[in-house]
Amino acid sequence: MSGREDEEEDLGTAMQKIPIPVNVFDKEPMDLDTVFGFADGVREIIEDSNLLLEESREFDTNDSKPSRNFSNLPTATRGRLHAPKRSGNKRGRQKRLSFKSPSDLFDSKFGITDKSCSHCGTRKTPLWREGPRGAGTLCNACGMRYRTGRLLPEYRPASSPDFKPNVHSNFHRKVMEIRRERKSSPPNSFGFSESYHSTRKLGF
């Protein structure tokens, strides 16, 4: 039998030994001495049962799991975690706007720069290409013809400041016609061929 069962048996045996007044189950009222005597007997049993309960608790604590000791746990810090502060120079920083003149804005919009093409002299081109004088020396149109071997002296794009309709063209077929005419006609006293004057009259 376990300690708790022994305790219940001792408590029940002690309760049986208490003299119960005869008038407890009667309808007639009992006197005060009888009531106080019964209460004193119950009080003694309760006090004795407390001793039995203490012994049973010691017995139970040996077999029970060890209780957690919360005193050894680290206490929570009172300080709050804060996000890292950003440096002040990054907040509110505004990029400085560089103001350009209207002419500069127009030139940058249409690709006009201070650089000029070494063949046609144009400054307006979407892309600078490699030429016989190095990288970025020809405009896009002249650079494409240079890569294919068709960059001839008679070729000029329409945007070239040196473009002359009677001696230049931006079409390869027309360029070849101008070259054939120059080779077929002998130059006159001014150094120009007859084909030069004929193309000038026709408006080419």
From Swiss-Prot:
One of its GO terms (biological process) is regulation of DNA-templated transcription. It comes from the Eukaryota. Residues 185-196 have a biased composition (Polar residues). Residues 57-66 have a biased composition (Basic and acidic residues). Residues 79-98 have a biased composition (Basic residues). It holds the Pfam family GATA. SMART domains: ZnF_GATA. PROSITE patterns: GATA_ZN_FINGER_1, GATA_ZN_FINGER_2. It is found in: Nucleus. Residues 57-102, 180-204 are annotated as: Disordered. Keywords: Activator, DNA-binding, Metal-binding, Nucleus, Transcription, Transcription regulation, Zinc, Zinc-finger. Coiled coil: none annotated. One of its GO terms (molecular function) is DNA-binding transcription factor activity. Its main location: nucleus. Belongs to the type IV zinc-finger family. Class A subfamily. This is GATA transcription factor 14. It comes from Arabidopsis thaliana (Mouse-ear cress).
